[in-house]
Amino acid sequence: ENIALAFSGKYDKSHAEHYLSKHQATLASRLSHWRDVQLARKALHMAGDPDLVLDLPCGAGRFWPMLAEQPNRVIIGSDNSSNMIATAMQSQPAHVVSRVRPLQTSAFDINLPDQSVDSIFCMRLIHHVGDPAHRAKMLREFHRVTRDTVIISLWVDGNYKAWRRQKLEAKRAARRKETGYQNRFVLPAGQVESEFEQAGFSVVGSL
């Protein structure tokens, strides 16, 4: 089964460039990005500072400078969108890009052999995947490709930021008069942990 998220076809060149700029557009977005980087750095340390990391989806490469801080780390910069990868390769610093191996592939069908990376670094993706069967397929694919860890960001219930996100998504749905389509999901923490375990993972920690 080929799985494509509803928004995945929108990233032409202009959308990819907009995605790059939006994380630096305002003070709030810059602070949010700074916080994301701090948390990601801590998560990598918890994962043993892996040497070979698959950044999927890499987007416009906003985490590449942080991933490249470890001198011997190899980064596979992967995204479903070739425009995203091209934007990342053109916009990130040359000394960082030289450390990156680009790979266009889907998170649901990763074009890599079994146990081929030390860690999969997955930021800002799973909250777009509303179908539990699709999440299960993605997590099973992650389990196949990594030989050690997965670092994954998601929105779970039970905290203020998740509550704000739920309120925002409710407003968006009302404004668009949507009849079932959602692009972002806040998930119950217990459900997420169960899905991880069913895919073969054990939760080492959370931030």
Q: Predicted segment positions?
A:
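A conserved beta-strand element that flanks and buttresses the S-adenosyl-L-methionine
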Residues: 121
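Class I SAM-dependent methyltransferase SAM/SAH-binding core
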Residues: 54, 60-108
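Conserved class I S-adenosyl-L-methionine
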Residues: 1-47, 149-173
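Short conserved loop adjoining the S-adenosyl-L-methionine
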Residues: 109-114
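Short catalytic micro-motifs in class I SAM-dependent methyltransferases
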Residues: 124-128
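Short alpha-helix
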Residues: 182-200, 205-206
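A short glycine-rich, Lys/Arg-flanked "PGG" loop and its adjoining helix->strand segment in the class I
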Residues: 136-148
